[in-house]
Amino acid sequence: MRKNSTSNPSPSHQFLTPPKNTTTVVNNNNNTFVNKNKIINENSNQKMFSVGSLVNQIDKNQQQQQQQQQQTHQVLPQRKFSGVSTMISKYNEQQPSSSSSTASSSSSPSLPPKPLLSTINNINNSGSANNNTPSNLSPNTLSPTSIIKKNNNNNISGSPSPSPSPAPTPTILSPLPSPRRQLPTRPPSPLPKLPSRPTSPVPPNPDEALNTTTTNNNNNNNNNNNNNNNNNNNNNNNNNNNNNSDNNYISKLGSHSVKTLPIPPPNDKPAPPPRPWSSSGTLTTPPTIATTKTSTNINSTNVKYQTLSPSSTTATTATTTTTINNNVTTPPTTPPSQTIAFNNNNNNNNNNNNNNNNNNNSNNNKPLPPTSTKPPRPKIAPRNDISPIPVTSLSTANITNTPTVVIEQTPIIAPIQDSQNIAASDLRTLRQRTFTRKQASMKLNGEDFSSLSLSTTPTSVSPSTPSSANPTPSTTPPSMSPSNSVSNEFLTINSNENINNDLINSFNSDDSNNSNNSNSSLSLASASSSASTTTTSTNSLNDTSFNNISININPNNGLSVSNFISSHKKKTSFISGTLRRDTLDIKTILIEKINVQYTITTQLSQKPSRKSLLPPINSSTSFNKVIKEIIETEADYIDQMEVIINLYYFAALEMSKYKLMTANDIYQIFSNIEELYYVSLRLYPMLLNIIPVLDHENQYPNIEEIFLYNSKAFQRYGSYLSTHDHSIKVLNSLIDGNNVVNQIFQYVKSLPHSKQLNLQSFLIKPCQRLCKYPLLLRELKKALPPEDDSLEAEEHHKIFQRSLILMEKIVNDINGKMANDNKIQSTVKEIGTKDIEQQLRDQTFLKSSNRIKKLKKKGNKVIVTLYLLSQILIIFEKGTFKKKVKIIPLKNILEIIDIERELQFGISINYLNDNDIQNNNNNNQNNLSSTNDTTSSTPPTTTTTTNSTPTTTTTTTNSTPTVNVNTLSIKLSCDNYQDKLIWLNDIDEAINILKILTGSYKFNVSEKDINININNNNNNNNNNNNNNNNNNNNNNNNNNNNNNNINENNINENNINSNNTSLENSGECINNNINNNNNTSN
């Protein structure tokens, strides 16, 4: 026996699991069979494990594993066999039961049966496929990954080779893995025959059913001679001819989802990500889609296409005719469908390999499916190079007659030498790109879609020419010059009959969702042979080319240019994220709108300025010079106000539409500047009327009367001047915080009429103008001749003086109002509560003091601030952590008392709450109603006695009961006695002024005046003349009161009766009679 030597297996053999009790056949140099369990390679002196020892080791491991399972009561999952191990297990199952005995390590060797060898063995390198002798068999039949090295010597350790013995009974192989070794992934097994491709389920809606086409592609392999019906690939590399498969994607036109999607065949290697450009410089485009358009009534249509040869520099055309028949029998629920597509062909020769790429079917009006990526941009061809045009057709529905679609293509400008097809998806959004850009952001050769205007004739629509006054004319790029530019593409659609509106709308809606990256032109025409047509031509400037758009629309169909353009606006869809969109430049839009406004204003006022339009003014005297200065400065002032309103104010309103400014910001900046503009427009014609008077000597126009007449209008400057400082602060904050606002105002500043003045300089003009009016009037008064004895000159000077005083008063009042507003704002800022600003609105600030002390209930004093305004009294106490504000309306104050004895320099303010005032008013109303009832039931009694003694009259009235109201009081202490007296006087005067202004002030009448005994003594002896002499008797009233006992017999009974009736009246009637008597006596 030879000495067995073993060696550890290499790491690549760690996953080997040789079966139990197997014999190994070793092919020696002498072609003899040796039955051995261990083999030694003497040349390499490398020790190898024999099969028997490995099997024994596996048995031991299996027993240990079973013992562990029994102890833990766990069942380990068995390995699923695949590949060669599966074949071995199948072979063991086919053997008879007699072969299941286990062979020992000393059993004679035997070869595996021939069926096993023919199933799993590979043919030896000798090349004899029919020789099945043991010398030609590989030693790794049962374990294809194991390596058992040959013995090059005939004898091992000098021992003779034993003779071959008959083969024992074959044993059952057990390919269990070793639990101690981590098995790597198994090498891939041969791929089985692939089944046919599945398709997506049929849509539930039968109306959306599509015509599907099945393509059987043949794959011819020269080595295996296998025919596959999945791919039509002819591999030229290694004697294989490869053909790219023709994928027919069928979807519905106008829908955003694909109904049938083929599944790509599996590849051994993952497909690389799509690249927009290949290494050879050709465009790699994904397969496009052949879409179908369902319709109910479709007649046979002939679609003609004209294409250009890619190799020729001149426009050579080839005509392809596609005929679509509608004689297709379809179920009642499924309408017939049309398949209309682009066909793009690319022919490239690389290393004698003919590859047909991009044999795709798609529709011009259908977007890509959601599973595909964005189609790449077309490769740009060199100048004067002609690119092939994809065959296109437009899906039509409800077409009564046969439309003809003709496509003519001219060369496209591009800087690459290789001619390249333009993808259908790149051409289809030209209409969308042309019509969906915002009007303000489009620069159509200096024009805009908003400039489209209908002419007087009904057969044409022409765009209006751009204004020559536009300061920013558009220029044509150098590449667009006639010498460098190439003619554009034209797509013309001609129809002999009327087209339904639904067709046009569906066509427009489909086009609006497509993206177009090619620089081509589109011409759409749909005309009627029996009716007049309307033609619209617009020259538009895109990024790199002009688009000539010609639209022939039948007016009988109710279509219009505005409807056609509005229907091509961008619509949101699932593919909208992949569309190429133009960004909206707000700055450009605003500048264009300002240019339009500037053009309008300059056209309305053809003359540059009002000052240049003034007639010549006589300035021979100093008085005329001052008047000339007033008129000229007023003309310039109006022009400046127009710049503010027409340009700056207009720009601010436009920026508010884009939320760059708010309406509150605009009001705070410009205030009531429009009112001031209209005041000046009213004053300016009056000033112009006095110019002819200046030509006459010794005549002075009554200019002062103009200012007197407009004195109330000048008071509108008050609110503007009071908020001017705040408006400048708001404007500066907006300019500093927003760059767009700053740029827009800077652009307005650069316009000619602005004269390089910013908005801050214009906003101060009204303030300067109002303050200049009194100065000019003062100069006019100085220029007047000295007063003479004439009444006219004296009256003239008086009017001038009056107008001057009035204008100065207006300015002072405005300045005082500004100062008052500043004080109010400082008060609001100091108090700092929420409602204080609203309560201080429309208040006049009178005085304040922060040295007043308030007496609390405990006896201590707190320093407070006392504010006296026109209608309220504020007591503000600023605590450490909290502010206390007490607001007392002046109308609620009952009295102010000097409490010097109780509190040094102290005053007490007694007032009512609002609730108490309401209750008091309600009680007064009830009392008045009760007194009215009593007076009606029991009238006052009057007793009149007429004797020789003086007459006495007694009147008794029911007085109203007084109402007891709980009053509140606040005790304050001033700094000194003088301040106390001043505060007492000021508060009392403010209360009385408020009562007078509101009409609640009552004059007290004493009881002596009410109970006066009126005795009229008349010296007239005629009783018939007493009624005519009442005035004379009243005139002598004061004298007759001292002589009551004289002429008693001459008392007129009528006078007594009149006096008695007057006594029955109320106190107001008595007072009126007394006043009448006094008036007559005077």
UniProtKB/Swiss-Prot annotation:
Residues 622-817 form the DH domain. Residues 20-29, 62-71, 96-109, 116-160, 170-184, 211-244, 282-366, 450-473 have a biased composition (Low complexity). It comes from the Eukaryota. One of its GO terms (molecular function) is guanyl-nucleotide exchange factor activity. Residues 185-206, 262-276, 367-379 have a biased composition (Pro residues). GO terms for cellular component: cytosol. Keywords: Guanine-nucleotide releasing factor. Residues 1-29, 59-78, 91-394, 438-488, 504-524, 920-961, 1017-1060 are annotated as: Disordered. Residues 838-994 are annotated as: PH-like. The keyword Oxidoreductase does not apply. The keyword Cytoplasm does not apply. Pfam families: RhoGEF. Coiled coil: none annotated. Residues 1-15 have a biased composition (Polar residues). InterPro entries: DBL_dom_sf, DH_dom, RhoGEF_domain. The PH-like region is similar to the PH domain but contains an insert. It is unclear whether it is a real PH domain. GTPase-activating protein. This is RhoGEF domain-containing protein gxcI.
